[in-house]
Structure formats: C-alpha cells, structure tokens
Regions:
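Glycine-/charge-enriched secondary-structure boundary and capping motifs
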Residues: 12-15, 35-155
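Short, acidic (Asp/Glu-rich) active-site segment that either coordinates a divalent metal cofactor
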Residues: 1-31
Length: 155
C-alpha cells in the first residue's frame, strides 16, 4: 500500500509494484522443500513476524530473528529509509516462504533451488509464540505492528 501511495517512477519502484500486483508464489520451492524433509513452513503474505508468531505458537516454541539478515530489497530501503525495517518485518504481501527446519535440511534445499535461501534466525525453547527481533547491536526491537490479522482486520 505504501508503494501505491508514491509516484511509481520514484526510485524505479515499478519492479516492486509489479511484484505486488502479480505475485509469484514459490510453489516449486515449496515442493522442493517438502521433498528435502522440511516439515514446517508457510507463506509470508501476512507479515514475517506475524506469520512466524503463528508457527511458534502452534509449535510451542519461540524465535529470535536478526534484522540485519532479513533480505529487504535495496529499493525498499532507499524509498523508505525510516520505515524499511517495519515493512520487512510486518509489511506482508511478500508471498515468500518461511521455512523452519534443521540447518542441514535447509542446506539441501538451497543446493537444489534456484531461489536463494536466507537464514534469518533460530527457533527453540521459550515462551510459545514469542518472536524477538534484534538489531545489529543485539538490542531488542519493539514492533508496534506484527502483521495482518484476518480475524480482527488490523495490521
């Protein structure tokens, strides 16, 4: 939505708008991940942190994410210098996959995939459903928005 509110020629944002208007779901990657042994994953259409919270709550686990490892396109960082982190963490409509598996399973997926995979954090014991996001200095970020919630209609 924030992209649609801007001049699309501004900073060459047309490629990002095209990706928003014509999403390419990662169906092949999903099948590849399943065949490699990934047993937990979902799309990130409702926001990375919000969707990761759903996975953690359903699994009885917690997650820690490193902001610096989240692959936010340079164009988004340029267009939204003060808000790119929130967009990357809670923006949604990315239609990328969030996969949860042991490192060796994800490495096997990465070897066979044309889509680059990025490890953004770890999942383990902790308060079920809690997602902690840390900046480059290790400080915890406090997010006002976690993502879209279809049940209450709020982001």
């Amino acid at each position: 939505l924030r992209l649609l509110q801007r001049d699309p020629t501004d900073l060459g944002l047309t490629a990002l708008l095209d990706a928003h208007r014509r999403p390419q779901p990662r169906l092949v990657l999903g099948r590849l991940a399943l065949s490699a042994g990934v047993r937990c994953g979902m799309d990130v259409s409702d926001g990375l942190v919000g969707d990761l919270q759903k996975i953690c709550a359903a699994s009885g686990l917690a997650a820690e994410v490193r902001l610096s490892d989240i692959p936010v396109p340079a164009l988004v960082r340029e267009a939204f210098p003060e808000g790119w982190a929130e967009l990357g963490l809670a923006g949604g409509e990315d239609y990328e996959l969030l996969l949860v598996a042991p490192g060796e399973v994800l490495a096997a997926v990465a070897e066979r995939s044309d889509v680059p995979l990025t490890t953004i954090g770890v999942i383990g014991a902790g308060l079920p459903g809690r997602v902690t996001v840390r900046d480059a200095r290790g400080n915890t970020l406090n997010l006002e928005r976690m993502g879209w919630d279809h049940l209450d209609g709020r982001a």
